């Protein structure tokens, strides 16, 4: 019995050890491998120090991909976080609440659909010849706006980003619905008695009361925006040219097309630093706002 009591505390260390094994060790190994020039087909590795990072920061494709990720992040914050909050507030309004289960299902459905299916759907919608989008524009007399949405440098990235927003906004809205349901009805009732309208209630009650969920949503959205891969890779492959290249597709091509494993490890390290820095900034911002 005494021996069992001695063992039990060590059992609680198992999850931490598993986390260390599958998360931290691969991260450190990736950083270590980024200091070498090596190929997946050869066991030999040549130590080159920070040369991969120097080349990366002089590579115009890296800055093109980073710019696209920043654009992805900005649009995602506006559409997913702010848009998701507005959508959740509308679905939780008393006038819409009886229809809320139906609309929740409609908006959450894209979240559970495979990205491959979604890509095929939007590939059909964006098709320049038979796509629904161009046919709709022609039907309302806007023929001059029709184009190859995924094949045009000026629209490829925005078209890919739209797919992500369509798929993800419902998930963020569901998170906000849970948060809004925890807000006491007395706050809204008092605001109505003071003559506050729907918009005033939204900005003075809903937004402040869902601040913690907003923090979670922003961190998730920013992390997703800087690690996005499926949408640009399946829809455009990073093209046309490098118009829709993002850091993850850039990493993938460097590793598995060009077999530049050390260079790809350097890209992965930079992505890790960016996402970690953004998360820490959000934590600092959230703590500051909470203290105020």
Curated annotation (Swiss-Prot):
Span of domain ABC transmembrane type-1: 66-282
Main location: membrane
Topology with respect to the bilayer: Multi-pass membrane protein
Membrane-spanning parts: 7-27, 70-90, 106-126, 160-180, 215-235, 260-280
Assigned GO CC terms: plasma membrane
SUPFAM superfamilies for this protein: MetI-like
Pfam families: BPD_transp_1
Domain of life: Bacteria
GO biological process: transmembrane transport
Entries under CDD domains matching the protein: TM_PBP2
Cell compartment(s), UniProt: Cell membrane
Gene3D superfamilies: MetI-like
Classification via InterPro entries: ABC_transporter_permease, MetI-like, MetI-like_sf
Record key words, sorted: Cell membrane, Membrane, Transmembrane, Transmembrane helix, Transport
Protein's job: Probably part of the binding-protein-dependent transport system YurMNO. Probably responsible for the translocation of the substrate across the membrane.
Similarity annotation: Belongs to the binding-protein-dependent transport system permease family. MalFG subfamily.
Official protein name in the record: Probable ABC transporter permease protein YurN
Organism placement in taxonomy: Bacteria, Bacillati, Bacillota, Bacilli, Bacillales
């Amino acid at each position: 019995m005494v021996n069992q009591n001695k063992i039990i505390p060590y059992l609680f260390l198992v999850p931490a050890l598993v986390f260390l094994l599958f998360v931290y060790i691969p991260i450190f190994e990736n950083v270590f491998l980024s200091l070498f020039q090596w190929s997946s087909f050869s066991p030999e590795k040549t130590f080159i120090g920070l040369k991969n990072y120097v080349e990366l920061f002089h590579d115009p494709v890296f800055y093109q991909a980073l710019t696209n990720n920043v654009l992805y992040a900005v649009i995602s914050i506006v559409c997913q976080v702010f848009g998701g909050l507005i959508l959740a507030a509308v679905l939780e309004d008393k006038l819409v609440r009886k229809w809320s289960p139906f609309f929740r299902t409609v908006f959450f459905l894209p979240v559970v659909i495979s990205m491959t299916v979604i890509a095929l759907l939007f590939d059909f919608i964006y098709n320049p010849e038979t796509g629904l989008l161009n046919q709709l524009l022609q039907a309302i007399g806007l023929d001059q706006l029709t184009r190859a949405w995924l094949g045009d440098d000026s629209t490829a990235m925005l078209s890919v980003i739209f797919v992500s927003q369509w798929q993800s906004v419902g998930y963020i809205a569901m998170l906000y619905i849970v948060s809004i349901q925890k807000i006491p009805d007395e706050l809204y009732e008092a605001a109505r008695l003071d003559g506050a309208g729907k918009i005033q209630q939204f900005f003075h009650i809903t937004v402040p009361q869902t601040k913690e969920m907003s923090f979670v949503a922003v961190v998730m959205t920013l992390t997703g925006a800087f690690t996005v891969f499926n949408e640009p890779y399946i829809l455009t492959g990073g093209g046309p040219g490098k118009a829709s290249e993002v850091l993850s597709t850039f990493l993938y091509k460097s590793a598995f097309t060009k077999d530049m494993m050390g260079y790809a490890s350097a890209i992965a390290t930079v992505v890790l630093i960016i996402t970690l820095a953004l998360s820490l900034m959000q934590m600092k911002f959230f703590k500051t706002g909470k203290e105020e």
